[in-house]
Regions:
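N-terminal segment of the mature soluble domain
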Residues: 66-113
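N-terminal secretory signal peptides that target proteins for export/translocation
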Residues: 1-18
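Bacterial N-terminal signal peptides
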Residues: 23-35
């Protein structure tokens, strides 16, 4: 009788073992496919990305002074460029060769709404993609950081991202940019 009970127990466990082996095989296959796709992506050359400086959309500009505006926008632009390079999301190219063209266009209008002038700037710089970045300031407490990446040839939007901030400080802006880049890494949004 004891051997019969043992046989039943063994028989009951066998389907579980098959299911576990099947699940393990699926897991290993998935991991190998993921590793292969990451390796293939790593072998592709990085897209050349021109990162324009942050612009500020400030709905209270006439009412609430923001004396550190220029310094904070410059800090944010530099931090974003460095983070994209560090994470190897793009080949961020130097903005200096097109700085005069950028100044000329920016003096006429916002580069966020210039009807394609940003694409001309990107092509002049030899970029595959261009990143437009802006901070929308609702108040000193409520802000958001936004980025949009466009294909320099077609103008097609290839990625957008936005992060809400609470507080208008260097630290909140830095954390927002760090979060945005980390989110891009986690979602595999680089090199698009």
């Amino acid at each position: 009788m004891n051997s019969r009970r043992q046989h039943r127990t063994t028989t009951k466990l066998r389907p579980r073992h098959r299911t576990a082996r099947f699940a393990l095989a699926l897991l290993v296959t998935g991991l190998l496919a993921s590793a292969w796709s990451h390796a293939a992506a790593a072998q592709q050359p990085l897209q050349k990305l021109l990162v324009l400086d942050f612009e500020l959309i400030d709905q209270q500009a006439d009412v609430v002074p923001f004396p550190e505006k220029e310094a904070r926008l410059a800090m944010a632009s530099q931090r974003l460029r460095e983070a994209l390079v560090k994470q190897e999301l793009y080949d961020v190219i130097d903005i200096a060769p097109v700085a005069q063209l950028i100044r000329t266009e920016a003096a006429r209008q916002s580069l966020l709404e210039c009807n394609g002038c940003e694409l001309d700037i990107a092509r002049e710089a030899g970029a595959d993609r261009i990143l437009l970045a802006w901070v929308q300031k609702i108040s000193n407490l409520i802000l958001n950081i936004n980025v949009k990446i466009l294909d320099a040839k077609t103008g097609q939007v290839v990625m957008t991202n936005s992060v809400d901030l609470r507080g208008n400080t260097d630290q909140s802006w830095q954390r927002g940019i760090d979060f945005m880049v980390r989110d891009m890494v986690e979602k595999n949004e680089g090199n698009r």
